[in-house]
């Protein structure tokens, strides 16, 4: 059988069918991934006449074959986050730099990162599939691509060790924010992980104390565990912590050497930062104070109980030394030991 050619095609969905994992592909041509989220780019691509007329569905073998025939870029930066903390702004800023391919929460990646929760035997092929998926996304469709930045879903913090084993030399960032502001944002517009049972099997399911959490405390409990997981990464030297309030200046400030920011690009990045990351047609408007004022006493109490301690632990981490070459791993800050305690 002649191997399939996926030039200018990208995987848009990974799913299990009749006991085997399948991929849906769509043709993107040479159009860059320019929207705030990968799913937005997929929506645009599926409106193209070509994709209305022709779709491709394959097994994982085709993905592995394509990786062998046309190796793509490997990740140059992994971005973990708590959600609602500026990760989309970071992605949009890096997307504005020449040669950068930015994957923003692609659902096929999330599906493969969490496949072992559904099928324990998947651990035999999961890592290879994730690497092959990155290769497919890292194809040089425009010809000038040099870096592949991957922004994970917030709950993929619990799969961070798999990614660190695959890419131990790749720098990682962990973005976080005052948990009260995150919880209020999730109350306004809940994400998949903000509603128990909606996300499906994930690392949140096996966390201790879940049964004892009152329904009204779930968001604060969930955000607290995301902060704790991020702290663990940063304290072990596996990621650099970045508070929302440091954005966007940190990108061309102390993180500039790590991210390879050319000083000549700063005016352009500053202009991009002035737009709303999720609604680029609108100007950015800070909302932290409004979110804090919106929180009622019960929400404040839940955040203090479940999320304040890991947030303070992150704030207490020493700043990382500057990195002069983004192709090398991050130097490790002093190790820390932290356990989240419900007061």
Describe the residue ranges of each PLM region:
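PAPS-dependent sulfotransferase catalytic domain
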Residues: 4-232, 236-247, ...
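PAPS-dependent sulfotransferases, especially Golgi type II membrane carbohydrate sulfotransferases
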Residues: 1-68, 211-219, 223, 227-241, ...
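A polyampholytic, Gly/Pro-enriched intrinsically disordered region
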Residues: 121-132, 191-206, 285-294
């Amino acid at each position: 059988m002649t191997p399939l050619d996926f030039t200018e095609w990208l995987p848009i969905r990974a799913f299990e069918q009749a006991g085997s994992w399948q991929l849906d592909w769509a043709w993107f041509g040479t159009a860059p991934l320019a929207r705030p989220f990968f799913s937005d780019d997929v929506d645009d691509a599926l409106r193209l006449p070509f994709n209305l007329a022709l779709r491709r569905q394959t097994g994982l073998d085709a993905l592995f074959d394509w990786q062998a025939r046309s190796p793509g870029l490997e990740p140059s930066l992994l971005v973990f986050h708590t959600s609602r903390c500026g990760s989309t702004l970071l992605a949009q800023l890096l997307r504005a730099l020449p040669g950068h391919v930015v994957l923003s929460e692609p659902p096929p990646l999330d599906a493969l990162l969490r496949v072992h929760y559904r099928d324990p035997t998947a651990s035999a092929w999961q890592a290879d599939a994730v690497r092959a998926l990155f290769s497919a996304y890292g194809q040089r469709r425009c010809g000038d691509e040099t870096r592949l930045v991957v922004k994970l879903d917030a709950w993929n913090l619990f799969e961070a060790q798999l990614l660190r084993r695959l890419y131990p030399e790749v720098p990682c960032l962990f973005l976080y924010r005052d948990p009260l502001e995150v919880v209020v944002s999730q109350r306004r517009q809940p994400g998949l992980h903000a509603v128990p049972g909606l996300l499906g099997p994930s690392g949140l399911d096996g966390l201790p104390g879940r049964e004892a959490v009152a329904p009204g405390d779930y968001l604060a409990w969930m955000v607290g565990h995301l902060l704790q997981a991020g702290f663990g990464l940063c304290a072990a030297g596996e990621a650099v912590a970045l508070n929302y309030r440091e954005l966007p200046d940190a990108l061309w400030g102390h993180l500039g050497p790590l991210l390879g920011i050319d000083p000549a690009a700063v005016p352009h990045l500053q202009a991009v930062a002035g737009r709303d990351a999720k609604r680029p047609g609108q100007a950015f408007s800070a909302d932290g104070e409004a979110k804090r004022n919106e929180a009622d006493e019960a929400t404040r109490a839940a955040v203090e109980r479940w999320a304040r301690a890991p947030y303070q632990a992150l704030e207490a981490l020493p700043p990382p030394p500057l990195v002069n070459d983004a192709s090398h791993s991050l130097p490790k800050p002093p190790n820390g030991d932290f356990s989240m305690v419900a007061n």
